[in-house]
Amino acid sequence: MMDPIHQFNIEPIFTIGHIGGQEIAFTNSSAYMFLAVALTSLLMLGTGRRLVPGRMQSIAEISYEFVADTIRTTAGKEGMKFFPFVFSIFMLVTVSNLVGIIPYTFTISSHIIVTAALAFLVFFTVLIYGFYKNGLRFFKLFVPSGIPVVILPLVVTIEVISFLSRPVSHSVRLFANMLAGHITLKVFASFVTMLGAMGIVGVFGAVLPLALVVALTALELLVAFLQAYVFTILTCIYINDAIHPGH
């Protein structure tokens, strides 16, 4: 059976240069990041503005309205100033997840360094804007209203720890789900290949694993969208905390 972890290896494509004796290379991960951005740009810029939209234009409009409605629901109208930021994250995660389902491709969201970079980008955006807009009133985020003074120090400590751990939970959730899903797919696909190589008996034995691979692929399609949605809605919730820290 082929190593199910091999699909996550980062391989250099060509060397860009050296900094401090360290090789700086353009990798397969970098290539698929560029691909995700290129596909998103093609979808959003390559579609027309026809009165009767085609398939690509419909997908672009649905994506736009979906993210816009999510922001309005969680962060209000004021949160719409973050629409370009949130929409970019949503499309990057969605497209990279979908591309990763295609056999022999690379899933950038299955690497913790990528999801952590996105999570910390959200975290510092919220932190900087929260202090920029509210000043010291941003600390109200850590003091829930109606809390008795006796337990206030404990609650504040818990809230601060919870806030600081956001990038960890935000990134690990996406990374772990994509990693586990792709490993499972690889394992069952390997079973199909091995049984099929055993001849007529193996072909019949491969029917069940093949059916499971098809079912798991369909499930991974759902997970690809679901994880992008979860990552996006958490981003919107955190942005709402920066806009309305006292709520």
UniProtKB/Swiss-Prot annotation:
UniProt keyword terms in alphabetical order: ATP synthesis, Cell inner membrane, Cell membrane, CF(0), Hydrogen ion transport, Ion transport, Membrane, Transmembrane, Transmembrane helix, Transport
Organism: Nitrobacter winogradskyi (strain ATCC 25391 / DSM 10237 / CIP 104748 / NCIMB 11846 / Nb-255)
Topology versus the membrane: Multi-pass membrane protein
SUPFAM superfamilies, sorted: F1F0 ATP synthase subunit A
TM spans (from-to): 24-44, 82-102, 112-132, 141-161, 194-214, 219-239
InterPro entries, sorted: ATP_synth_F0_asu, ATP_synth_F0_asu_AS, ATP_synth_F0_asu_bact/mt, F0_ATP_A_sf
Principal subcellular localisation of the protein: membrane
Similarity comment: family membership: Belongs to the ATPase A chain family.
Quaternary data: F-type ATPases have 2 components, CF(1) - the catalytic core - and CF(0) - the membrane proton channel. CF(1) has five subunits: alpha(3), beta(3), gamma(1), delta(1), epsilon(1). CF(0) has three main subunits: a(1), b(2) and c(9-12). The alpha and beta chains form an alternating ring which encloses part of the gamma chain. CF(1) is attached to CF(0) by a central stalk formed by the gamma and epsilon chains, while a peripheral stalk is formed by the delta and b chains.
Cysteine-cysteine disulfides: none
Keyword ATP-binding included in the entry's annotation: no
Localization per record: Cell inner membrane
Protein name stated in the entry: ATP synthase subunit a
GO molecular function, one term: proton-transporting ATP synthase activity, rotational mechanism
PANTHER family given in the database record: ATP SYNTHASE SUBUNIT A
Function: Key component of the proton channel; it plays a direct role in the translocation of protons across the membrane.
